[in-house]
């Protein structure tokens, strides 16, 4: 499986983003602390994607943003299915959810619990997961085959500081109203 990572182009998935591809030459990459990356794929069709969400849900009502778990998951699943995936073929790999700071509530554990519950409720099997702990991870995901690589990030103090700042901004930002282009068909 490691051969699928050779001779590929890397596409970075940032916080609050998701990417989907059918191109076997593309590998998605992200760095996670307390955030979660769900890697969902249909290896029979050769399509998959990765999201990267910051919080399981918004503190206020109406937080429609890919920064939040439910919306991020719906965007990813819908994006994969629009590229031809069959729902019955979907599989998932889940990463992240670390406790990055003693000063934060255990956002990572909440995120990990959310994504596991969401995938179970949607009937999408989690083939593998690496969640929790206290260190950041770098994840690479070959979406067409479902192959994934994870390495722990040695010096993750800066990532913890960045996550604290991102959480504070997210909690302080008013929820935006979705534009027509943001409408998603939920299933």
From Swiss-Prot:
User: Where do transmembrane segments lie in this chain?
Assistant: none
Q: Which residues form the signal peptide?
A: none
> What catalytic activity is recorded?
L-glutaminyl-[protein] + H2O = L-glutamyl-[protein] + NH4(+)
GO BP of this protein = chemotaxis
Q: Which Gene3D superfamilies match?
A: 3.30.1330.200
Q: What is its EC number?
A: 3.5.1.44
Q: MF terms per GO, please?
A: protein-glutamine glutaminase activity
Keyword Transferase tagged? no
Keywords assigned by UniProt, alphabetized? Chemotaxis, Hydrolase, Plasmid
Q: Which family does it belong to?
A: Belongs to the CheD family.
Query: What this chain does, per the record?
Result: Probably deamidates glutamine residues to glutamate on methyl-accepting chemotaxis receptors (MCPs), playing an important role in chemotaxis.
Q: Which HAMAP family match?
A: CheD
- What is the protein's given name? Probable chemoreceptor glutamine deamidase CheD 1
This protein's species is Ruegeria sp. (strain TM1040) (Silicibacter sp.)
Query: Its gene?
Result: cheD1
